[in-house]
Amino acid sequence: DELSVTDFMRKYGMPERINEEVFISMAKALDFIDPDKLSMTVVLTAMNRFLNETDGLQMAFLDGNQPDRLCEPMKQSIEKNGGKVLMKQRVKEWVLNEDDSVKHILMANGEVIEADEFISAVPVDVMKRMCPEPWTKMPFFQQMKQLEGIPVINIHLWFDRKLQNVDHLCFSRSPLLSVYADMSTTCKEYYDEEKSMIELVFAPCSPIAGGKTNWIAKSNQEIVDATMKELERLFPLEIGKKAPDGVGAKLLKHAVVKTPRSVYAAVPGRNKYRPSQETPIKNFTLAGDWTSQKFLGSMEGAVLGGKLAAEVVSAKAKGMKTAGLKKINDDIMAEASTFSGQGWKRPQKMEDESPVVFGAGYVLEENDEQQLMTIDPEQLTEMDGRSQATKDAVQEAVLNRTR
């Protein structure tokens, strides 16, 4: 885990062509970053799964959109078994008891939620912002300072004709594009024999991930223009002036979904800081793909992290022994002994309206960007094409962060 993919290659004398033919596309697909930034552990873990699991190489798509085809059936199952799912509820803070256990959750609307057990499944950057101050002094939670989510952009493109495609997820070595698929072929809900709907991942999209441009700070139109230019280079016979008809496929509409902090950046040396699902807080458990488990920061990792969190809660409820806390690295223990509160990202409030506050991907409007500035101004350091008011707000947010 201490070596990047490129460092690993050089150490063991692997030719550069392997990087160009294999690792660039793997790195961008697995963690949305370039191989010189990615821990080799991520690639080896993925290859191990591919080779040792019966269906390890198979790719699967939902047959429709995620809220309806995945989330709604889960919600119905919970409600059928007596549970309740509350939507669009914003947490203001976790209120603690004297022993630092959770007393209740205070919602933005003033409601108080009491429970025997509490589980957090938010992204690591959101967890860092919401972490109660007494917990920030604990070595267990200080591990989170070593983990940082990276930005990613998903782009949806609707064309006026059917493009040549394969019924599969495609991996790219493009400097801008990561993975893509023609959803009109791969997904039942979007099936269309006449027109293509391409979904792709735009990555790396910031210097954090190895990119040269902070695309999160660019306008949606700038991102779409760059994407179309790259697609024209990759598919000259279908898109652009080199197509047989001299025009190529016409873009009918588009959607740009930005996730300012997505999966944690699996850069070298980070894996040892992923915390266990069990925490030092007796009634609080962590879930999420960034917690310690065999998979990467991914949907698979999120599912497994949730399963392990459920096992912790279930074992405690039955009075059974749990797996216990993961050993904390020595450097974290040493730092915790002299912790002064510096370096912990904590915005003034957490009840803002925009979904990006809680780690969601979103089609950002200007008001969403201004809320993003409050919690993560580094994401919007380049504001070409934005209003002067927005630029001024960025500068003010950065100043407030450094004061």
Regions found by a protein language model. Give the residues of each.
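Active-site/ligand-binding neighborhood in enzyme catalytic cores
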Residues: 1-103, 108
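Residues forming the flavin
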Residues: 63-66, 72-76, 90-96, 101, ...
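A short coil-to-beta-strand element that immediately follows conserved catalytic motifs
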Residues: 87, 238-258
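Mid-domain catalytic core of redox enzymes
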Residues: 89-211, 219-235, 255, 351
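FAD-binding beta-loop-beta segment adjacent to the flavin cofactor pocket
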Residues: 188-192, 257-286, 290-292
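A conserved FAD-binding loop/helix module that cradles the flavin
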Residues: 291-313, 317
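Active-site-proximal substrate-binding core of FAD-dependent oxidoreductases
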Residues: 314-391
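N-terminal mitochondrial targeting presequence
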Residues: 400-403
